[in-house]
Amino acid sequence: MTQSGPTGDHLVEMLAALANPLRLRIVARLATGRDYVSHLAREIGVSRPLLHMHLQRLEAAGLILGSLELSDDGKAMKYYEVAPFDLRLTATTLAEAAATLSTSDPVVKESPR
């Protein structure tokens, strides 16, 4: 059997990251184009520290990519964009992913909402 999707551990991490409504909104917004933290926070209507926490979680799951860039006035700005991914869940892909789990009961580190 050839593994075509993410490993079990990566799938758990991706799905856990997307299980939060705010993180799902962030990915949906970034799917329309890259953006920097301050603008994204204003657009979504959350504080920068809260947004940053969620961006870190999405980046750790491999769903978004962040890059530091200099603005015209020399200010460092972190831009985020959606990472290329294609997630299709079927019984077969779930079975393949489950077979690669590093433990029978993975613990997902989640901050309280």
Give the label of every model feature segment.
Residues 1-7:
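Long, low-complexity, charged/polar intrinsically disordered regions in eukaryotic proteins
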Residues 61-73:
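Beta-hairpin "wing" of winged helix-turn-helix
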Residues 42, 59-60:
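Alpha-helical residues within the helix-turn-helix
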Residues 10-47, 72, 76-81:
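N-terminal helix-turn-helix DNA-binding core of bacterial DNA-binding proteins
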Residues 54:
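Residues within the DNA-recognition helix of helix-turn-helix
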